[in-house]
Amino acid sequence: MAEVKKIATRESYGNALVELGQENPNVVVLDADLAAATKTGMFKKAFPERHIDCGIAECNMIGIAAGLAAAGMTPFASSFAMFAAGRAFEQVRNSVGYPHLNVKIGATHGGISVGEDGATHQCCEAVSYTHL
């Protein structure tokens, strides 16, 4: 039996983005100044021309992702769960959900065990925000 290597979910996410980028030139990855934390930096290293750091601006990131999807790209927008679901909720609903755009949202660091970042980064309500 093959030995299972235990790695963080976010590391698997980064690896998967790189694999998808190799298979599909329309994949583009956006993050909100969190490339190291969400592991989108792995994609950035492999495909710098298809990575967009939107800064600490999740709402804007979702709007950019919606525009890219409308233009035929396959965007993966990545942030912490609190900000991807909470801060950007209206943009996700109006700019992605209503027009049924193909935007993938990668939300890491959900729940209450996000280490030293504290209560502002903890998100238990992400499931209720996104249960549409």
Predicted regions and their residues:
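Phosphate/diphosphate-binding glycine-rich loops and adjacent basic-rich segments that engage nucleotide
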Residues: D117-S128
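Conserved acidic/glycine
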Residues: M1-M42, A46
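Conserved small/polar residues in nucleotide/adenosyl-binding loops
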Residues: T130-L132
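A short acidic, helix-capping loop that chelates divalent metal ions and anchors anionic groups
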Residues: I112-G115
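Thiamine diphosphate
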Residues: A35-K104
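Short, well-ordered alpha-helical scaffold segments within catalytic/effector domains
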Residues: R10-G14, C59-I62, F89, C123
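Hydrophobic alpha-helical scaffolding
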Residues: E3-I7, M82, A119
